[in-house]
Swiss-Prot record:
UniProt keywords, alphabetically: Glycoprotein, Glycosyltransferase, Golgi apparatus, Lipid metabolism, Membrane, Signal-anchor, Transferase, Transmembrane, Transmembrane helix
Residues in the Cytoplasmic compartment per record: 1-7
Pathway: Protein modification; protein glycosylation
Cellular component, GO, one term: Golgi cisterna membrane
Tissue spec. comment: Expressed in brain, heart, lung, intestin and kidney.
Reactions listed under catalytic activity: a beta-D-galactosyl-(1->3)-N-acetyl-beta-D-glucosaminyl derivative + GDP-beta-L-fucose = an alpha-L-Fuc-(1->2)-beta-D-Gal-(1->3)-beta-D-GlcNAc derivative + GDP + H(+); a beta-D-galactosyl-(1->4)-N-acetyl-beta-D-glucosaminyl derivative + GDP-beta-L-fucose = an alpha-L-Fuc-(1->2)-beta-D-Gal-(1->4)-beta-D-GlcNAc derivative + GDP + H(+); a ganglioside GM1 + GDP-beta-L-fucose = a ganglioside Fuc-GM1 + GDP + H(+); a neolactoside nLc4Cer + GDP-beta-L-fucose = a neolactoside IV(2)-alpha-Fuc-nLc4Cer + GDP + H(+)
Glycosylated position list: N189, N255, N283, N309
Family matches, as CDD domains: Fut1_Fut2_like
Keyword Cytoplasm: no
Protein name: Galactoside alpha-(1,2)-fucosyltransferase 2
Keyword Membrane included in the entry's annotation: yes
One of the record's GO molecular function terms: galactoside 2-alpha-L-fucosyltransferase activity
Enzyme Commission designation: 2.4.1.69, 2.4.1.344
Organism this protein belongs to: Bos taurus (Bovine)
Amino acid sequence: MFSTQTFFFFPTAPFILFVFTASTIFHLHQRLEKMQPTWELEALEPATMETPSRPQPRPQLKGMWTINAIGRLGNQMGEYATLYALAKMNGRAAFIPPQMHSTLAPIFRITLPVLHDATARSVPWQNYHLNDWMEEQYRHIPGEYVRLTGYPCSWTFYHHLRAEILQEFTLHAHVREEAQNFLRGLRVNGSRPSTYVGVHVRRGDYVHVMPNVWKGVVADRRYLEQALDWFRARYSAPIFVVSSNGMAWCRENINASRGDVVFAGNGNEGSPAKDFALLTQCNHTIMTIGTFGIWAAYLAGGETIYLANYTLPDSPFLKIFKPEAAFLPKWIGIPADLSPLLKH
């Protein structure tokens, strides 16, 4: 009696090829995990400017952080950027109030999620007040559910994350294109300018608040003449794009007879996107005072002239505001004329 035995033959060549391919992919993946892509390093380089140290973000812990949404556009940009930076520094998830989203989202491509009011009301928040400058204690803020308060708007909070902050405050395409189309149409004595300087003149309530409350001044005609002349001496045929919440005053006090000044802003504080976009799309900035001008200069990059020393030494404003924390070290200050305050 013969026994029948059946043999199964596995194809040798395909099997060896499969093992070789799988081994190659596995070891390649292991090597890639140990390498940092060069584009990541390049993207981080701008964020290292002018900051003494780069704090490492902690692993994200449980809980959530938010911040008060108070003030107009410049204030809320400062609040957003501060929340973004401090939450990351402390390893917490960050959420913004709906009011902040309504202010910023129509203009910028922000990414922080919204914490709706119904949810926020059920959270046991711990309020944590911030000064308008970075302090060491803010690196170790206790609490899982923290609501940051105050009016923080200082590069000392977030400049180590400059590349990320610029990404958060990227203009929507239609906002940017409208501003760029306007700028492309400008001419200086018939020629297209090669250098665009945004000029923001803060007037409005500050005209009365600064002298009567803060023992300070707003920018005058002489300051603006000096600032414009600084750029005229440095660049060939620049054009100055003026935005203000006091455009009538600007037309009366800024000399446009050379043909290099354009009064472009609408001064509408309720819809600031157009004015802000125009300023950020310029190469350089002249600002006076206020967070609107500070942020326009920060996003534009380039060279910035600002009004310096615009309060008396005993001003109560200096208890809540540090000029060195508001203006980047590389920006150039022109001292204000305080003589009107000394006449009283």
